[in-house]
Structures are given as structure tokens and as C-alpha cells.
Amino acid sequence: MIGLIQRVSRAKVTVADELVGSIGPGLLILLGVEHKDDEASAAKLAQRIANYRVFSDVEDKMNNSVIDAQGEVLVVSQFTLAADTRKGRRPSFSSAATPDQAQHLYQVFCEQMAAQGLPVKTGRFAADMQVELVNDGPVTFELKV
């Protein structure tokens, strides 16, 4: 499972011009699910991201998690993160989970983030989404489990 996290001052996702999720300061999480992933992977990645220290403390060092910063979370499914881009001019998605598996694990991941006490907003699974964000920093990390 892959989480591309971006520290944002705000972010929103729309589908067909309908706002489906928006947050203020917090994390935008683009989530890629691979066929080898399971519920334990989702729980582990959620725990790791919720506690990953990417927010500044009073000394301007990255010592605070999104929990510490009392931030919000916007989770957007993105199967393209599971692409193999090592060869050729077209990505291979052979390691991506099936849509049913990915949707289930996406939901489990979101539930696990909420269980950490975080306000969680989401995109719409498998929809053609427009994501707008203001990356704070910019700060972007890729986490894998």
C-alpha cells in the first residue's frame, strides 16, 4: 500500500463540479492499493501516516504529526501510484489491486485514520476527480508498507 502525503493549508476534491470533500490545514493523502495488500497493510499505513511528523513545532522543526497539529485529512484513491514505470513508455498496472479489493481497503484505511481521532474527508472511489490543493512547504512524502 502506498500513501503519497502532502502537507496542505487547504485541499478539496470535486466530481462533475460537485464538491465531495474539502479540508483546511492537514494532509492530502493519495492512496494506492496493490494486489498484495490486506487489512493489516491498511491499518499499518494509517497508523504510520497519522503519527508521521511532518508539521513544524515551535522551533520550526518537523516534530509534530497531523494529530499533534490538530489537522484534517483528505483521502483520495489513486491507483496510478501502483504503476510500474521502470520500462517502456507506458505504465503497467499489473501490481494494482482489483477494484473490489482496492475499494474495500480504501474504506478500511479511512476508518483506521478516523479511529486515530482525525477528521477524515474523502474523494469518491473510482470517480474522475479534480483535486485542488495548496501544498504547504512544499512538503510531500511517499510512504509504503
UniProtKB/Swiss-Prot annotation:
Cell compartment(s), UniProt: Cytoplasm
Motif extent (Gly-cisPro motif, important for rejection of L-amino acids): 137-138
Sorted UniProt keywords: Cytoplasm, Hydrolase, RNA-binding, tRNA-binding
Reactions catalysed according to its record: glycyl-tRNA(Ala) + H2O = tRNA(Ala) + glycine + H(+); a D-aminoacyl-tRNA + H2O = a tRNA + a D-alpha-amino acid + H(+)
S-S bonds: none
GO cellular component: cytoplasm
Top-level EC class: hydrolase
Keyword Nucleus included in the entry's annotation: no
Coiled-coil ranges (or none): none
Pfam families registered for this protein in UniProt: Tyr_Deacylase (PF02580)
GO molecular function, one term: D-tyrosyl-tRNA(Tyr) deacylase activity
Enzyme Commission number: 3.1.1.96
Main location: cytoplasm
Keyword Cytoplasm annotated: yes
Gene3D superfamilies: D-tyrosyl-tRNA(Tyr) deacylase (3.50.80.10)
InterPro entries: Daa-tRNA_deacyls_DTD (IPR003732), DTD-like_sf (IPR023509)
GO biological process, one term: D-amino acid catabolic process
Quaternary context: Homodimer.
UniProt free text on domains: A Gly-cisPro motif from one monomer fits into the active site of the other monomer to allow specific chiral rejection of L-amino acids.
NCBIfam families, per database record: D-aminoacyl-tRNA deacylase (TIGR00256)
Role according to the record: An aminoacyl-tRNA editing enzyme that deacylates mischarged D-aminoacyl-tRNAs. Also deacylates mischarged glycyl-tRNA(Ala), protecting cells against glycine mischarging by AlaRS. Acts via tRNA-based rather than protein-based catalysis; rejects L-amino acids rather than detecting D-amino acids in the active site. By recycling D-aminoacyl-tRNA to D-amino acids and free tRNA molecules, this enzyme counteracts the toxicity associated with the formation of D-aminoacyl-tRNA entities in vivo and helps enforce protein L-homochirality.
Membership in a protein family: Belongs to the DTD family.
Protein name: D-aminoacyl-tRNA deacylase
